[in-house]
Amino acid sequence: MTSRRAAALLAAALIVAVAAPLGAYLKLGTLVGSRTQSLRWREFPVRYFINNNGVDQVTPQQFQAAIGRGFSTWRGVETAQTSSEFVGFVNAQPFVADGASVIGFQSRPDQDRTLAATTFTVDVTDGHILESDIFFNSTFLWSVADGGAADRFDVESIALHEIGHLLGLSHSALGETELVAGGRRVIAAEAAMFPIAFSRGNIAGRTLKADDIAGISDIYGTPAFTRDFGSIAGRVTKAGRGVKGAHVVAFGTRTGKLVAGFTLTENGDFVIAGLESGTYLLRAEPLDDGDINSFFDTDFGVDVDFRVAFHDRVVAVPRGGGVRDIEIKVVAK
């Protein structure tokens, strides 16, 4: 039995992604019986095709090279095992359930805030991905220039984000935006999986951050990942009750790296995995700086009625071990 799922990267607005339980970042998932199973590929390499239609200033060959660099960046994560294989150019369009993973341009003027989107065909008996397509919206202007091009979005940056979806990651909330005419502008992003793209001409999105690396390693981790990295588990509570949908951020006092997770149960439980050994400051904050629907289904029941709060102690994470029973207490606004 199969089903289709989708996730998107937007220019100034957001779209639904499905969350799997209890992990740093968010992982895409599907219901298997009464539980949510993380989406993942059963076998590598992921074999993909490129649609043979180019756009202004981007030939199919240039597009394929940029897509290949995006896959290579994910493959370069030392604590995760992924690989890909470009099979060839085809006339087939993305977003068609035909058993082939196709990446290409499509003109979608009706989606005037969607830069690109990823869809899946999933085996709902076990959560394995059978096919995943990515479309880039040719309504926008695109570039593959090494240093970016003014007034054009960078193919490689957007590809890195969408390939993260293709591999099973959802969105990260590690970023800051400001309201501008027509939507929000990204000021800073600490994850390639942040759901709003950098502005035209910007190529900062070509780089993975600690949160992305922790996420992909959680899904496809190497033995070294389990051996060398630790986790923090606990709850976010308000007046003694769990807070659902809180964003919990771990800040490494030595490294300065940020890895984050969410409370995904009524009990307010969270787990942040993929942490280097060391000490961390923990912060819980509401998802009130954007569209909640870019992270959770509309009926998930996210609580945003609380103030930012910090755990009252620095947390020491051992190499290959975990810290449990952390409680971050928040108060209503």
Residue ranges and their predicted role:
Residues 1-10:
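Bacterial N-terminal signal peptides that target proteins for export
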Residues 20-333:
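Zinc-dependent metalloendopeptidases
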Residues 10-17:
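Bacterial N-terminal signal peptides
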